[in-house]
C-alpha cells in the first residue's frame, strides 16, 4: 500500500506541476519500519524530495551515509535531556529507556557530514519548561528548529495526563525566549491555532486525514480516489500553511 500511496502523491505533483513537492515520512517511529530504505529509494526514483522525522534512537552513521543524495532533511524529535521529563512526556521505550544525548550528537554530526539538512522538533509542555534545551541545540547545530506548543487532538490524545501537560501561552513564550537558537538556523514557532487545518497526513493505508477544529477527521483514501478530489473536500487553510512555510528551504 505504501508504494500505491507514493504513486498517488507523485501523480498529484505532476498533474499540478509541483516541482518541489516533498514527502515527509513520520510516525510513530518510521525507522522501525523494516522496508523504510526501499520506500526511500522508491520516492527518490521519482525525484520527490524526502524528509524523515525520527526520535533518532535507531539512526546509525552507515544509514545516514546511505541516505546522502536521497533524503533532503532529517528531523529529530527531542523534548528533554532529563530522563524523568522524557518518561513523563512518554519519550521512552517499554523499559523506560530514554534517548542518549551523546548518540544524538554523533548522529547530528553524521547528518551534517552527509550533506543532509538537520531539523530539531521540540514539543513544549509543562514537563520540559525547566529544561536547558539551548545547550542541546548548540551541540546539535540544526539548520531548522521548530518549537511546538503541545497540541491536543480531542479524539486522539485527550487524556487527563495529556491535559495536565498543557502550558500557558506565557510559559510557552518564556520557554522560547530561554531556548531561542538562531545561529545559522531558521527558528519556527508553532502554536495550536497555527496547526489546525494547515497540514494533512496520509497513513500507509492511503487514508487522508487532517486536524480540523481540534479533531482528527478522515476525508478519503488516496489509493482508491485521486488526491485532487480528496483535497477538494478538505477544509485546508492554505494561508496558514503558506505562513508556516513561506521561508522554508528545507
Language-model features: locations:
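Conserved alpha-helical substructure of the radical SAM core
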Residues: 1-52, 58-65
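Short, compositionally biased "basic patch" segments
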Residues: 4, 8-9, 71-82
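Acidic (Asp/Glu)-rich catalytic clusters
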Residues: 10-17, 66-71, 113, 137-141
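Hydrophobic faces of well-ordered beta-strands that scaffold small-molecule active sites
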Residues: 21-25, 50-52, 74-76, 118-122, ...
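N-terminal pre-triad scaffold of radical SAM enzymes
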Residues: 21-25, 199-206
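Alpha-helix N-cap/loop-to-helix initiation residues
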Residues: 32, 60, 126-130, 230
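Radical SAM enzyme [4Fe-4S]-AdoMet core and its adjacent flexible, acidic
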Residues: 79, 83-197, 204, 209, ...
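Cysteine/selenocysteine-centered motifs that mediate thiol-based redox chemistry or coordinate metal-sulfur cofactors
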Residues: 232-250
Amino acid at each position: 500500500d505504501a508504494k500505491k500511496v507514493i504513486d498517488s502523491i507523485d501523480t498529484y505533483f505532476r498533474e499540478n506541476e509541483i516541482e518541489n513537492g516533498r514527502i515527509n515520512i513520520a510516525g510513530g517511529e518510521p525507522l522501525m519500519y523494516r522496508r523504510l530504505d526501499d520506500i526511500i529509494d522508491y520516492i527518490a526514483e521519482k525525484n520527490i524530495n524526502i524528509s524523515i522525522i525520527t526520535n533518532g534512537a535507531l539512526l546509525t552513521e552507515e544509514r545516514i551515509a546511505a541516505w546522502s543524495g536521497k533524503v533532503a532533511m532529517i528531523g529529530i524529535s527531542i523534548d528533554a535531556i532529563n530522563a524523568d521529563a522524557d518518561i513523563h512526556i512518554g519519550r521512552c521505550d517499554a523499559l523506560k529507556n530514554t534517548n542518549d544525548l551523546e548518540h544524538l550528537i554523533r548522529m547530528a554530526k553524521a547528518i551534517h557530514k552527509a550533506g543532509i539538512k538537520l531539523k530539531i522538533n521540540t514539543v513544549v509542555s509543562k514537563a520540559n519548561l525547566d529544561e536547558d534545551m539551548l545547550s542541546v541545540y548548540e551541540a546539535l547545530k540544526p539548520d531548522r528548529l521548530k518549537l511546538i506548543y503541545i497540541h491536543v487532538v480531542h479524539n486522539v490524545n485527550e487524556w487527563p495526563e495529556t491535559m495536565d501537560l498543557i502550558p500557558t501561552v506565557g510559559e510557552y513564550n518564556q520557554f522560547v525566549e530561554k531556548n531561542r537558537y538562531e545561529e545559522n538556523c531558521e527558528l519556527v514557532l508553532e502554536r495550536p491555532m497555527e496547526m489546525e487545518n494547515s497540514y494533512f497526513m496520509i497513513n500507509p493505508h492511503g487514508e487522508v486525514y487532517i486536524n480540523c477544529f481540534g479533531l482528527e477527521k478522515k476525508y478519503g483514501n488516496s489509493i482508491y480516489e485521486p488526491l485532487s478530489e480528496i483535497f477538494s473536500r478538505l477544509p485546508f487553510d492554505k494561508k496558514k500553511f503558506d505562513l508556516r512555510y513561506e521561508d522554508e528551504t528545507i
